[in-house]
Amino acid sequence: MEILNNNKWERPVYFAVTIGPDSYVGLQDYFRLEGLAWRLVPVKYGSRGGQPIGIARDLMYTNVMENFQWGGVDAEGEIYMDENNRRMTTNIRLQLTNLAESFATSGASARGLEVLEKLVRVTPSRNVPYDRIMLPAIELLSEIAQDPGLTEEQRSLAGTLAKQVGAELFKALSDDVRYYIALDDAYYSAASSEIQVAMAVTQRISGSLSDALPDDEEVQAMAESMSQLRSAQSARQQGPLSDPPVFNPDAGS
């Protein structure tokens, strides 16, 4: 409060998006996202579940599309990304998805699509593999692909990106589940939470892509693979599988 009193809002006060809620000191209702930092402002945006929800859409859009430097995460050649850099990339993906969702829910799906296309391009999976943090982006792209207010070209791009990212994440997570259900009881039980999360995420990926691209053969194959995965997991819950089912290795790849 002394800082705010002295600077009279003439100098900005920022909180990094990487800090936890304990560091918000009760000010999260007055946070506004401008990139990878929350700016403290004299406007009450509110919060949800203790998390800030304010976003300066146009300012953050300019930062993302024109000002941010990506530090080589989008490099074409082989690069080494350590755990810290991977975590930061995950944070970038999360915040850009939040920005895109804010545009889409305000009726500006075209701008939301631009942000998501940028996200996929500058944080490629070849350098930082996709994880479940990408699920909201996949679902949002699937929704944008069905937006009648966009051009056919825009809807097609959204569908292509949704399938590209969704298929890759689906393949990775379904492979994880297949590995887990082949384990003996002790290890299988220890992985129960990971299995539940992976099953839930793959189900949502398959469902959102099926809604957006119901006639796409790859999406249909993914839905069939999801059905087989559910059957295998259900059978495994009854005990070890003596004859594990054969899955289509190309589904979701």
Regions found by a protein language model. Give the residues of each.
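ER/secretory pathway lumenal C-terminal domains and tails of membrane proteins involved
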Residues: 1-253
